[in-house]
Amino acid sequence: PTSEVLVIAGMSGAGRTTAAHALEDHGWDVVENMPPALFGTLAELIARSPEAFPRLAIVVDVRSRSYFEELYAALQHLANSGVEYRTVFLDAEDHVLLQRFEAGRRPHPMQGNARLLDGIRAERDVVEPLKARADVVVDTTELNVHGLATEITELFSESGPVTLRLTIM
């Protein structure tokens, strides 16, 4: 048996937590905000006992270039340990991320004393290389929470895409 491993990254406010909850609802084990330093240990555990981790999603939050470099090294370690994984990147247009942060009345993690939009742009600069390497990019600009959950379910549920069956009598 092999493990199905997803590494989920993306812009703050693009829906990583919503994606994690959707995966949990469909039987995935989810680890949120795991430091890259622990990837090596996790890779060894998965390689040793893949049946213990049939479907594992690791949600990462890349907030600095050094974190990105650490994450990339950790992903290499996963691959070198024989663990196959896919990366999913969640994104949305800046104006939508801005609206989401304003609606939630929360500061952007990279904002500091600058404007909210500056924080979003700083994060985009840092995560762009990860987006370029992602296996799947999901644009959440036009999606609400339920739409994103449906999209994630269709992409990664065991049964494949969810379909509507209509029976007319």
Map each language-model feature to its residues.
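Short glycine-/polar-rich loops that comprise or flank the Walker A/P-loop
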Residues: 3, 26, 52-55, 81-86, ...
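A conserved segment at the C-terminal end of the G1
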Residues: 16-30
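Conserved nucleotide-sensing/catalytic segment adjacent to the nucleotide-binding pocket
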Residues: 26-76
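Conserved beta-strand segments of the P-loop GTPase G domain that flank and frequently precede/overlap
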Residues: 33, 58-61, 88-91, 138-139, ...
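A glycine- and Lys/Arg-enriched "phosphate-lid" helix/loop adjacent to the NTP-binding pocket
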Residues: 83-128, 136, 140-141
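C-terminal accessory "lid"/substrate-recognition subdomains
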Residues: 118-169
